[in-house]
């Protein structure tokens, strides 16, 4: 049996040094940036290298699942109420993009929240990294709102003060979801790429493109 550390190493293959440096000069973002910081399905398709014909956009954080291991909740998906809901949340936007309405061969999710203060955004980021301490190396069932259940194994590198990366792999498949969370000034942005094989480079490009629209 592989150790948890070995399993995490396998999950993280391809992630590497995917976190970009924080610019030396930055200013807080305006709430309106969420309207264009989430990329449209055409741009997403260019990044993942596959046609993406379906998308669903939301202006409120949503969670449509529950997990057996609560410590893995905030790694199971992005754009979650537990992370983003805050009295100082000024604006929010997210989008799910996939191959088609019935095909999730490639599935991408983006989420971004602009907060009234840097402290509020930092609190949201810590609701990701603090509440998932101990999830790396774990396997848990994920129960979806449609009644189906998936089983995922999780791995993640140690987060920094501003960046977190993690991977989950579906049981008995080569399907993995590569995820990044980036804290930039008063913004928390998240990106997730799910596919067979290595989606690490794609999620890094996606998160970088989202960040570039903010000028942060």
What are these regions (language model features)?
Residues 192-216:
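Surface-exposed amphipathic alpha-helical segments
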Residues 106-109, 173-179:
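Short, surface-exposed coil-to-beta transition loops
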Residues 1-26:
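Secretory targeting and sorting signals
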Residues 25-97:
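N-terminal "mature-domain start" segment
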Residues 93-100, 176-184:
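Short, surface-exposed beta-strand/loop micro-motifs that present aromatic residues
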Residues 94-125:
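A short acidic-to-branched-hydrophobic micro-motif
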Residues 108-111, 182-195:
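Short, well-ordered beta-strand elements
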Residues 51-53, 58-61, 66, 130-175:
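Short Gly/Thr-rich strand-loop-strand
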